[in-house]
Regions:
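Cysteine-dependent hydrolase recognition
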Residues: 1-232
């Protein structure tokens, strides 16, 4: 998300892409879904109805985590209002994700009006299980640094194979960063929660009786194959 009023243009999309690559390269057990505004048609009002539709579809299917990087405010994501407080209040999905919002003011909980981020957490029929979110204006470079550090801490396994708690992930993230931008990020939710990370790994050891090596396997159409593996 970028606009003509600032110099960010594609910066937010590039930052989001970097986060997706981190998951794909380091935590391949998780699937990433990316929603690019410009991959969809923009209507006459200046917004992207199909982006809103796609976000809604993904949330209904169930997501571990939803991350937005870009412009925003207390009631909406982006200058194009692709996801708004009204959308949040009207949602009916039941599988609640963790929300990460690297955008300005999304959860300004000390304002007289209820913010969109608060609506995510207070929503009785939908919303989110927890939020790593913002209470004030934040800057793009600082958001990117915090987002990357947060991902490293959220998805890193402890010695017992479990993920860190959300509170520990936020604590370690802020501890490793300097500057004041981090002070505008908060965790809303139970700090003792952990992401739903598989405690074990599945490893393929052989295909058609042949041990796994650096040599590629060749399969024919409709061929039946036997895959062997182990749980680590």
């Amino acid at each position: 998300d970028g606009n003509n009023a600032d110099h960010y243009t594609s910066s937010h999309a590039e930052q989001a892409d970097e986060l997706a690559r981190f998951i794909e390269e380091n935590h391949g057990a998780f699937l990433t879904n990316k929603v690019y505004f410009d991959a969809f048609k923009r209507d006459n009002s200046g917004t992207y109805p199909d982006v809103r539709k796609r976000i809604s579809e993904l949330l209904k299917k169930g997501q571990l985590l939803i991350n937005y990087t870009g412009h925003g405010n207390t009631t909406a994501w982006s200058d194009e209002y692709v996801w708004t407080q009204t959308d949040i209040l009207q949602s009916t999905y039941t599988k609640l994700p963790i929300w990460v919002t690297a955008t300005c003011d999304f959860t300004r909980f000390d304002d007289v009006n209820t913010s969109a981020g608060e609506s995510v957490f207070l929503n009785a029929k939908s919303g989110g299980i927890a939020l790593f979110t913002t209470t004030r204006v934040v800057v793009s470079s600082g958001n990117s640094a915090l987002n990357k550090e947060l991902y490293r801490n959220l998805f890193e396994r402890e010695s017992d194979g479990r993920a860190r708690t959300l509170g520990e992930a936020m604590m370690e993230t802020k501890r490793k960063l300097s500057g004041i931008n981090k002070l505008n990020f908060i965790l809303i939710g139970d700090p003792a929660l952990r992401i739903s990370y598989p405690e074990y790994k599945a490893q393929v050891t052989a295909v058609n009786g042949k041990a796994i090596s650096d040599e590629p396997f060749t399969f024919k159409a409709l061929e039946k194959i036997t895959v062997e593996g182990e749980i680590l």
